[in-house]
UniProtKB/Swiss-Prot annotation:
The modification Phosphoserine is found at S112, S205. Residues 108-138, 217-236, 305-329 are annotated as: Disordered. InterPro entries: C19orf44-like, DUF4614. This is Uncharacterized protein C19orf44 homolog. It comes from Rattus norvegicus. Keywords: Phosphoprotein. Residues 115-138 have a biased composition (Polar residues). PANTHER family: CHROMOSOME 19 OPEN READING FRAME 44 (PTHR22409:SF2).
Length: 624
């Protein structure tokens, strides 16, 4: 049955790239080859499906453009295979990739210091994949457990079973690179389905060749590490160039590669400690003599984890997360430890849009360099500790470094909560290095804002001393709360106003008294006029109150002195009876009339006599 999906359709999950770069005919052809290979295998033989060399080179190998900057070609895996089968498949593909790369391009020798990581991870893959479900819930605890186990176990897991490796052409150690190791680890992390396990009867020539190869690689890696990791700066710069040269069409691929590479390198630390203990005859003290090995591994592991978180915010992540088919539970468990600290697209998107892919890759290189330096300082502080204590401390620092870039991408405000520096020396040196590096990327304003804000906040917090006052005492003090000294008549202003308003030793203190200075400075004509008006108003109010009290007391006093209050009805009748006149009779009336007539008659007689006298002539006066 041919698949009807488009060859470049959206993948089904964050790490599911099964149908990218393959059309329906290629998918059908690969399934047929797998079916034929499965039918030819016996029950006791290897569980790995054998494909012909032409199909592997045509579809399952990355092209030359993987290092030239044209993108990474993803390989196709069967739908679901068990964890041990994924480890064996990864080792087989690693050999094929190395064969292809060696024919076309010679990798520089500067990468040889990092070859032991990818080689040592091959030996730890069977043990690592067996505990996938446990590591998904407790990734830090599982890593520590693996470090403790690998110092005791050794190569017993490979000798007890049959060959899990296919016969292949091996290459010298100088031809390996961390990019190829990342490709191999990516194949292990792809979602697969489980098949019934098949055990091997006896070891064959493939296993013997693999043991010889791993032994030679471990010896070459030990010689390189004893040189003091002098080529580490050049290696870091070359690694940044490889990631910057990749095409921006596949940011999701970069995130996957960086995440796989970080897991591979963190696992290889335990095997490197195992190889050192084997060569030193089982002496644990030999592990403490080479702290540079652990420093190199953990610095690159921390930087790879930051690259994964930075690149996870690219726009292609949205297309990757859109799924049409459910992902199996085994795939979710194996990838849980990589998704635990990666936020969603909504949390990582900035306010004014996505950042360009070039800016994201530039920030990836900057954060990688910064965290490498910080991790190296942290590791160099404890060179004399035992192997278990050193692995525990560096595992904790790696876990903290996994959380720090997430906080920087989401919100710079919470960056102080995720402080990871172990001492003041590492803090100052990492701040200076980060400021110098960020000055080169001043063209991207958003990139500088995301990377520079937490640093400026940290420096500001160290140099500024805050003076906090309660709300109740933040008001102004009274303006005229003076305190005068009584010794010698000196006028001095107390601590209320301080010495900022007048000279602490007034020049007029010997001439003008303290009362005069207080009168001149504390009062003004307006204050005097207001005081006079208030005094007059107060006196008027007092007079009004006194008059009111006087009227009230006078009224009460007059009411108390008067004994008469009111008359009753009986008293009124008695008064009328006593003062009533006597009744008038006829005789009394006639007598009153006669009296009146007599009076009138007398008046008339007087008038008559007067008229008569007036009528007589006047007599002459003698002597005239």
């Amino acid at each position: 049955m041919a698949s009807t999906r488009r060859p470049f359709g959206p993948p089904h999950g964050a790490f599911d790239f099964r149908d990218m770069f393959f059309d329906s005919s290629k998918m059908e052809e690969i399934r047929n080859v797998q079916a034929r290979s499965l039918g030819q295998m016996a029950p006791g033989q290897s569980r790995i499906l054998k494909r012909n060399q032409t199909m592997d080179e045509k579809y399952l190998l990355p092209k030359e453009e993987a290092l030239a900057g044209t993108g990474v070609r993803l390989s196709l895996r069967p739908p679901t295979i068990s964890s041990k089968s994924r480890a064996s498949e990864a080792l087989r593909k690693l050999a094929q990739i190395e064969t292809k790369i060696l024919k076309r391009r010679q990798v520089p020798t500067a990468w040889s210091g990092m070859e032991s990581d990818s080689t040592a991870s091959e030996r730890s893959l069977p043990q690592r994949t067996d505990t996938t479900s446990v590591s998904s819930q407790y990734p830090l605890r599982t890593f520590q457990k693996q470090v403790c186990k690998t110092s005791v176990v050794g190569d017993d897991g490979q000798s007890g079973k049959g060959s899990r490796f296919l016969k292949k052409k091996e290459l010298p150690a100088e031809a390996r690179s961390p990019v190829l190791a990342a490709e191999t680890e990516k194949q292990v992390l792809l979602p697969t389905q489980r098949e019934p396990a098949r055990k091997y009867d006896a070891p064959d020539s493939d296993e013997e060749e693999m043991k010889v190869l791993l032994g030679s690689l471990m010896e070459s890696s030990g010689e390189k590490e004893r040189n003091g990791n002098q080529e580490l700066p050049g290696t870091r710069s070359d690694l940044g160039k490889v990631f910057l040269d990749l095409t921006p069409d596949q940011p999701g691929v970069l995130c996957l590669l960086s995440a796989d590479q970080s897991s591979l390198k963190s696992t290889s630390v335990s095997l490197r400690a195992q190889s050192l203990q084997t060569r030193s005859g089982g002496d644990p003290a030999s592990l403490t003599t080479s702290p540079s090995i652990l420093r190199d591994d953990f610095s690159r592991s921390a930087s790879s984890k930051r690259e994964c978180i930075k690149l996870a915010s690219s726009p292609s992540r949205m297309e990757t997360e859109s799924s049409e088919e459910p992902v199996s539970e085994a795939a979710a468990d194996s990838l849980h430890d990589f998704r635990i600290n990666i936020l969603s697209i909504d949390d990582l998107v900035l306010a004014d849009g996505y950042k360009s892919d070039g800016e994201q890759k530039g920030v990836t290189t900057v954060v990688e360099d910064e965290e490498d330096l910080t991790t190296e300082h942290e590791i160099s502080e404890h060179p004399g500790a035992s192997s278990t204590a050193a692995v525990w401390s560096h595992s904790m620092s790696s876990a903290r470094s996994m959380e720090t870039p997430t906080a920087l991408s989401v919100s710079p405000v919470y960056s102080e909560d995720f402080e990871q520096f172990s001492g003041p020396l590492a803090l100052e040196e990492s701040l200076d290095r980060t400021l110098d590096t960020l000055s080169k990327f001043s063209s991207g304003e958003q990139t500088d804002t995301v990377s520079r804000q937490p640093l400026s906040r940290t420096e500001w917090g160290r140099g500024v001393t805050r003076v906090v006052k309660e709300t109740a005492v933040q008001t102004l003090d009274p303006a005229f709360a003076y305190q005068w000294t009584k010794a010698g008549g000196m006028a001095a202003i107390g601590p209320t106003l301080g010495g900022g308003y007048v000279d602490p030793v007034p020049i007029a203190s010997h001439i003008i008294s303290a009362d005069a200075i207080e009168a001149l400075t504390a009062y003004s004509p307006a204050v005097l006029a207001l005081n006079d008006m208030l005094k007059q108003q107060l006196s008027l109010t007092q007079q009004f109150i006194e008059a009111s009290h006087h009227l009230h007391h006078s009224l009460l006093r007059s009411l108390d002195e008067d004994s008469f209050h009111y008359h009753t009805l009986e008293e009124a009748k008695e008064y009328i009876r006593c003062h009533r006149p006597a009744p008038l009779t006829m005789e009394a009336a006639l007598q009153e009339v006669r009296k009146e007539l007599e009076v009138h008659l007398d008046i008339n007689d007087s008038h008559v006599e007067a008229s008569k006298a007036a009528a007589l002539p006047a007599e002459p006066i003698d002597g005239l």
